C-alpha cells in the first residue's frame, strides 16, 4: 500500500543533516548511509550517496529520475550467480 500524501515522504533525520552539511560545504565525497528506507528528495540530485547493501556501501549517483524512489532500490542485495548448467548441454 502506498504512503499517505498528507504524511509526506519519509527520510531519516540523520541523512537530511548529512545532505545539508554537504550542500553548505560543497563537498564531493559520497555520503555513507545505512538508511535504505529513505525516499530520494529533489535536494539529493547531483549527490553521491553510498548505500549499504548488507555487505558494503554501493555508491549511487542521484539523478532526477530517482526522485520519489527509495535509496534501497538502487543498491542490490542479492547476486545472481546463474543456474547450474545441464550435463546434456555440455556434451
UniProtKB/Swiss-Prot annotation:
Instruction: Spell out the GO cellular component terms annotated for this protein, sorted alphabetically and separated by semicolons.
Output: cytoplasm; small ribosomal subunit
Q: List keywords of the entry alphabetically.
A: Ribonucleoprotein, Ribosomal protein, RNA-binding, rRNA-binding
Note the Pfam families from the entry.
Ribosomal_S19 (PF00203)
Give any single GO term for biological process: ribosomal small subunit assembly
Checking InterPro entries in the record gives: Ribosomal_uS19, Ribosomal_uS19_bac-type, Ribosomal_uS19_CS, Ribosomal_uS19_SF
Q: Name one GO molecular function term.
A: rRNA binding
Protein's job: Protein S19 forms a complex with S13 that binds strongly to the 16S ribosomal RNA.
Name the family the entry cites.
Answer: Belongs to the universal ribosomal protein uS19 family.
Question: What protein name is recorded for this chain?
Answer: Small ribosomal subunit protein uS19
Protein's organism? Aromatoleum aromaticum (strain DSM 19018 / LMG 30748 / EbN1)
